């Protein structure tokens, strides 16, 4: 999460995740965010970046993969870009949301990692919610995850930004996906369970599965 490496826009609709016997999908969910949306480190939605890196092709390393299996009437577009702050994510909203009915907005950990103001990051998230609603989309926000490699210094900032996200959600009447609480280790508050993180920064495949199956809900 801390390395600002990827700046290419990744837009990939997950194809065929539900098999041939599932109902026709009628709702497109655009997911906009940083590496947590992208599926790092196991997946990157940009095929050119996968070719450059030589890895990142494990589709199961996305919460959207598991959410689509749990909700076969939905189709997901992955617009996650590794290392981006909320201001950078916001610039990609219109392209990501094109043709979608639902928009999931996720971001903020790279703002913290780069020493950016929490209030400024929250304002960026607010503008994305407002823009999504103006486009006629159902919008939902996502909490920041615990950050094992940033613990304990980053955790108070993560919790504070999550508080701001929930306040924004109440003001804008949009839901929040409980990413933090879903992956927080009850025995080690402020951190993800070891089995749920691949590198201390991002979820493992099992962590992404929990986010897709337990945390995701339609707005």
Predicted regions and their residues:
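Serine-esterase "nucleophile elbow" of acetyl-processing enzymes
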Residues: 17-79, 92-99
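Active-site segments of SGNH/GDSL-like serine hydrolases
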Residues: 106-110, 128-160
């Amino acid at each position: 999460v801390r390395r600002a490496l990827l700046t290419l826009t990744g837009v990939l609709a997950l194809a065929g995740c539900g098999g041939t016997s599932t109902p026709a999908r009628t709702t497109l969910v655009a997911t906009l965010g940083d590496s947590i949306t992208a599926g790092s480190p196991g997946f990157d939605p940009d095929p050119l970046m996968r070719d450059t890196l030589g890895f990142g092709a494990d589709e199961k390393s996305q919460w959207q993969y598991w959410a689509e299996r749990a909700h076969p009437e939905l189709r997901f577009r992955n617009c996650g870009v590794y290392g981006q702050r909320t201001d950078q994510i916001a610039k990609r909203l219109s392209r990501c949301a094109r043709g979608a009915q639902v928009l999931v907005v996720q971001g903020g950990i790279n703002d913290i990692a780069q020493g950016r103001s929490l209030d400024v990051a929250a304002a960026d998230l607010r503008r994305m919610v407002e823009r999504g609603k103006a486009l006629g989309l159902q919008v939902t926000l996502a909490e920041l995850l615990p950050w094992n490699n940033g613990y304990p210094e980053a955790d108070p900032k993560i919790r504070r930004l999550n508080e701001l996200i929930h306040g924004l959600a109440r003001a804008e009447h949009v839901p929040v996906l409980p990413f933090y609480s879903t992956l927080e280790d009850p025995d080690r508050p402020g951190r993800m369970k070891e089995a749920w993180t691949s590198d201390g920064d991002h979820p493992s495949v099992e962590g992404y599965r929990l986010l897709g199956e337990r945390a995701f809900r339609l707005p």
